[in-house]
């Protein structure tokens, strides 16, 4: 119940159904009887499950527990399972089964892949970098790039993925590539120009180009410098990004002006802006998006480029508990040895989409984009007929 803006709660007697106020809790607990309801699996050893409602702690006031449950339930409906997981673990004393885990598994996502048996009919190595068959629902294209290694380390490369976006942030995976070479080498980074120069042709003939792309600037000074220098001459498309591991950080922070050489002096006037991508928020957002199973707003389509390996990398993270000063919190962690390049690239591509949205009036962006293309914004029905054959990928460099 809610009274005068505050939660009140009572216990309902299982026999007479009459309400018992919280003020009677101590009286109830002192007169309770513990009765076994199951046969002991180990002879002579019994146990009882007692949850927080029996506690005398002020924090276990029934009204507080009701409020916490309602808040956790509301968060769960919005795609955030952490409050409910905490409530189930610490208040009810029960285990937590993440209902989203099955939805985001590689096997389940592979079932959504459209016409994979048709093969990869396109190559980004074509002379004019033209790719056809992009669904009509796509109004905007962004990219995310992850840096792997550098400075002569093993398996050094760039990993890039491209997503198309439409009304309601419905998304289509359009391309995924491994670009061999040292990410600290400007010649390796220059391979990204191929993606920026690509003409993405929709089924209705409308031509799109990459609107924005986020490049992970890596973890060392040399990689940061290389990425920032690359972006400084391509600021209309590429921006450097970096993960923000602290909880509570927004999915995409405000741009922070940074130097792009070791002398702390910008090579070009105003330098470049670095954007921090909130790790917790972006992973949580991706989990929610992958859990959307109805085509339309928020749904993510997978095409020919969405290989089994990419889908395995798309969401390897699991929510793991950590205890600090007696409090339990949950953090996203990938199992040891698990690859997450596909997920990182997708998080950066989605952050690039959020960067683009800052240019537009809220609620009118998709209509404005459609008008700029000379078309009408389609409904959220999957992007038009024949949109089942799309996407490209591979390795180059």
Region spans (language model):
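Cys/His-rich microdomains that often coordinate metals
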Residues: 1, 19-22
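Short, intrinsically disordered, charge-biased short linear motifs at domain edges
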Residues: 1-6, 330-333
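Short metal-coordination and nucleic-acid-contact micro-motifs, chiefly zinc-binding Cys/His arrays
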Residues: 6-9, 341
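Short cysteine-rich clusters marking metal-coordination/redox-active sites
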Residues: 13-16
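A contiguous, basic/glycine-rich beta-loop/short-helix subdomain that forms a polymer-engagement track
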Residues: 22-144
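C-terminal nuclease/phosphodiesterase catalytic domains that cleave nucleic-acid phosphodiester bonds
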Residues: 26-27, 91, 218-386, 392
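Nucleic-acid-processing active sites and adjacent nucleic-acid-binding tracks
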Residues: 92-140, 147-212, 389-397
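Short His-Asn-centered micro-motif
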Residues: 145-147, 211-219, 241-242
């Amino acid at each position: 119940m809610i009274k005068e803006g505050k939660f009140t709660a009572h216990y309902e007697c299982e026999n007479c159904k009459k309400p018992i106020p919280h003020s009677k809790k101590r009286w109830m607990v002192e007169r309770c009887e513990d009765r076994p309801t199951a046969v002991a699996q180990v002879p002579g050893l019994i146990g009882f499950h007692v949850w927080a409602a029996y506690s005398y702690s002020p924090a276990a006031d029934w009204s507080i527990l009701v409020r916490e449950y309602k808040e956790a339930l509301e968060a769960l409906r919005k795609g955030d399972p952490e409050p409910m997981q905490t409530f189930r673990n610490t208040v009810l004393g029960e285990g937590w089964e993440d209902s989203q885990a099955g939805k985001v598994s590689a096997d389940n996502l592979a079932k959504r892949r459209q016409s994979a048996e048709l093969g990869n009919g396109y190559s980004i190595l074509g002379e004019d970098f033209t790719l056809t068959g992009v669904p009509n629902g796509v109004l905007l294209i962004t990219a995310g790039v992850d840096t792997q290694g550098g400075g002569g380390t093993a398996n050094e490369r760039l990993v890039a993925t491209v997503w198309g976006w439409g009304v309601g942030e419905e998304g289509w995976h359009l391309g995924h590539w491994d670009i061999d070479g040292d990410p600290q080498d400007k010649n390796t980074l220059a391979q990204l120009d191929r993606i920026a120069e690509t003409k993405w042709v929709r089924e209705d003939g409308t031509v799109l180009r990459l609107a924005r792309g986020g490049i992970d600037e890596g973890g060392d000074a040399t990689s940061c410098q290389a990425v920032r220098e690359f972006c400084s001459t391509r600021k209309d498309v590429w921006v450097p990004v970096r993960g923000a591991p602290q909880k509570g950080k927004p999915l995409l922070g405000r741009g922070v002006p940074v130097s792009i050489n070791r002398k702390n002096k910008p090579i070009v006037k105003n330098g470049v802006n670095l954007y921090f991508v909130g790790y917790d928020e972006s992973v949580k957002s991706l989990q929610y998006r992958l859990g959307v199973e109805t085509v339309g707003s928020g749904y993510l389509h997978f095409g020919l480029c969405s290989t089994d390996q990419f889908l395995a990398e798309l969401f390897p993270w699991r929510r793991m508990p950590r205890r600090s000063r007696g409090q339990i919190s949950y953090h996203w962690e990938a199992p040891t040895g698990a690859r997450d390049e596909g997920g990182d690239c997708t998080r950066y591509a989605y952050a690039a989409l959020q960067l683009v949205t800052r240019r537009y009036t809220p609620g009118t962006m998709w209509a404005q984009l459609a008008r700029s293309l000379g078309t009408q914004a389609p409904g959220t029905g999957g992007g038009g007929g024949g949109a089942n054959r799309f996407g490209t990928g591979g390795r180059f460099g």
